[in-house]
């Protein structure tokens, strides 16, 4: 598989793509919904349980990374060298496909959020605009992973500003919020409570919806072939991303609960209004920019990781070998990236995602 690569460190190569996938669109658009369904205590239990599972996975990955010479392919490489290429391929191929399809989901999410936020973009065909964004993401990642990761620093700054705006915010005006409670019942607490209870989902359903939000560590692990010292960078970057992600999510849900208070009307708004977090914020624009950035960073992370998994599979003969061909001094997997793009484009054009 060669030893070519960019020579990234733990922060740039592992922590950055991992944390930007963990702090994603679910935090902005679905975390209020989680709180509205199960309350603060159970939200923290869901967050802790989900993070604990990811943390144990991170420890396992770290143990593998420190006990072998890690090359390109991330989780696939480590599994295949521990349990055999056949077992590795059985996991690596679905992993590649899931990351390629995720590029389509994140790109479409970015375009929908953009079109909903910008008046002149109303009416644009989401599929066509998504294809344009896909081309831009492909161009950024296929010619220079270094440039793509540098772009993620700006995305990280946008997400940081959105969090500052949120933490400086306060309780939103109930009149500006969408609500599961009809206007006629807003002042009738008994009727409002009955409506909210009928619309609320249980602990396990909410856990199933939220859990994928904190599993973004494979974006960083997938950069293993481009790390200067994978045995050090993978454990350090992965565990740091998990812990920072937990701290951010815990802080956000505690502040959300404080802003919403004990009002049943606010709980109804948490269930219905996806922009509740933005409407709590001191300034709305940084949060909208944060939502765009979260979608775009996740698309970039998946577009960086997926081709490298496919490249490693091809080097092992599990997929056609021409897909593993690398270009330039850094062994960029352009053929694998092209296939990733094609899969993502097909999913985008299927529509309704």
Question: What positions do the PLM features span?
Answer:
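Membrane-interface "cap" regions at the ends of multi-pass membrane proteins
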Residues: 1-62, 66-74, 184, 193-196
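Loop-to-transmembrane helix boundary motifs in multi-pass membrane proteins
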Residues: 6-14, 85, 125-132, 228-236, ...
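Select transmembrane alpha-helical segments in multipass membrane proteins
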Residues: 8-18, 45, 84-97, 129-133, ...
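Helix-loop junctions at the membrane interface of multi-pass solute transporters
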Residues: 18-19, 32-34, 62-67, 76-82, ...
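Membrane-water interface regions at transmembrane-helix termini and the short interhelical loops
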Residues: 30-37, 64-66, 90, 112, ...
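Helix-loop-helix junctions that connect adjacent transmembrane segments
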Residues: 43, 121-125, 157-288
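Hydrophobic transmembrane alpha-helices that form the core helical bundles
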Residues: 55-134, 138-139, 296-312, 353
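TM-loop-TM module centered on a large, flexible mid-protein loop between adjacent transmembrane helices
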Residues: 77-78, 116-120, 243-300, 320-353
């Amino acid at each position: 598989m060669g030893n070519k690569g960019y020579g990234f460190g733990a922060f740039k190569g592992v922590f950055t793509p991992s944390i930007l996938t963990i702090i994603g669109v679910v935090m902005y658009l679905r975390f209020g919904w989680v709180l509205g369904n199960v309350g603060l205590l159970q939200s923290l239990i869901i967050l802790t349980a989900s993070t604990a599972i990811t943390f144990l996975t991170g420890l396992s990955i770290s143990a593998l990374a420190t006990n072998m010479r890690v090359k390109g392919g991330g989780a696939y490489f480590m599994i295949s060298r521990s349990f055999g290429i056949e077992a590795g391929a059985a996991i690596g191929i679905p992993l590649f496909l899931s990351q390629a399809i995720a590029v389509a989901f994140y790109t479409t999410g970015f375009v929908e959020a953009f079109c909903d936020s910008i008046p002149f973009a109303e009416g644009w065909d989401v599929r066509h605009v998504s294809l344009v964004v896909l081309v831009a993401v492909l161009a950024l990642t296929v010619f220079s992973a270094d440039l793509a990761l540098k772009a993620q620093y700006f995305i990280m700054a946008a997400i940081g500003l959105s969090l500052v705006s949120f933490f400086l915010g306060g309780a939103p005006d109930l009149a500006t919020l969408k609500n599961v409670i009809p206007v006629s019942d807003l002042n009738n607490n008994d009727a409002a409570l009955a409506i909210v209870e009928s619309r609320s989902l249980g602990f396990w359903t909410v856990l199933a919806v939220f859990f994928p939000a904190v599993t973004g560590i494979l974006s960083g692990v997938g950069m293993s072939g481009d790390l200067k010292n994978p045995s050090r960078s993978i454990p350090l970057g992965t565990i740091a991303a998990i812990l920072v992600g937990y701290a951010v999510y815990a802080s956000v849900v505690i502040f959300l609960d404080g802003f919403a208070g004990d009002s049943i009307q606010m709980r109804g708004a948490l269930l219905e209004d996806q922009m509740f977090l933005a409407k709590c914020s001191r300034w709305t624009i940084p949060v909208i920019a944060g939502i765009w950035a979260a979608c775009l960073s996740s698309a970039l992370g998946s577009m960086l990781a997926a081709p490298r998994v496919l490249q490693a599979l091809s080097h092992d003969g599990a997929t056609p070998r021409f897909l593993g061909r690398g270009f330039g001094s850094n062994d960029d997997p352009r053929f694998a990236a092209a296939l990733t793009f094609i899969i993502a484009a097909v999913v985008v054009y299927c529509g309704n995602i």
